[in-house]
């Protein structure tokens, strides 16, 4: 078996995974994700080697789409594209947790600034607004009053990202 560990920043964890696999006699490669390229022409994209790929990219979208390309080429990837897509999207994750009756904060989704404002008026404060995609607390806003709601609405309306029109709010 040949294991390829794909990363975009070589951290302690990737080095340890590599070392432990080598110590167990597994042929292992560390592959930097940044210079990788793929093609829809399968014959052009087989330069990447491995029987199984452990996708360890910090960048959600880089890892997600590298996984998609590897699966297109019929490679086995841990974790699969569908798993990465769900886990990287708070709305999708929240829906699955709720459907599976796994306790989590009360969560609401709106799809316009106006409905976001109506929701905050109905629920009251404090609330928390989170981006659909992201980690490490980036883009998380505590909402304690209507002034904060108005500032967030203005910021989001100036942003060209389609995801900024979706408001993910938790009590």
Could you describe each region identified by the protein language model?
Residues 1-83:
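ATP-binding N-terminal substructure of ATP-dependent carboxylate-amine bond-forming enzymes
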Residues 4-5, 53-55, 79, 105-107, ...:
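Short catalytic-loop micro-motif centered on adjacent basic/acidic residues
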Residues 14-18, 67-68, 94, 116-117, ...:
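Short amphipathic alpha-helical segments and helix-helix/interface helices
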Residues 26-31, 70-139:
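A conserved helix-loop-beta module that forms one wall/lid of the active-site cleft
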Residues 33-40, 107-111, 163-166:
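Short gly/ser/thr-rich secondary-structure transition/capping motifs
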Residues 38-41, 115-118, 148:
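Short acidic active-site motifs
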Residues 57, 131, 171:
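Short secondary-structure boundary segments
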Residues 142-171:
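Phosphate-binding site of ATP-dependent enzymes
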């Amino acid at each position: 078996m040949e294991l390829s560990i794909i990363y975009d920043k070589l951290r302690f964890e990737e080095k340890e995974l590599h070392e432990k696999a080598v110590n167990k006699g597994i042929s292992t490669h560390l592959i930097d994700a940044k210079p990788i390229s793929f093609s829809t022409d399968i014959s052009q994209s087989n330069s990447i080697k491995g029987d199984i790929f452990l996708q360890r990219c910090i960048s959600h979208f880089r890892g997600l789409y590298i996984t998609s390309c590897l699966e297109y080429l019929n490679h086995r990837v841990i974790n699969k594209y569908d798993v990465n897509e769900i886990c990287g999207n708070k709305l999708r994750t929240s829906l699955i947790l709720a459907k599976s009756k796994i306790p989590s904060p009360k969560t609401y989704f709106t799809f316009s600034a106006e409905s976001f404002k109506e929701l905050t008026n109905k629920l009251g404060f404090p609330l928390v607004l989170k981006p659909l995609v992201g980690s490490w607390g980036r883009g998380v806003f505590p909402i304690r009053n209507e002034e904060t709601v108005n500032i967030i609405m203005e910021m989001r309306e100036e942003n060209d990202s389609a995801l900024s029109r979706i408001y993910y709010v938790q009590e």
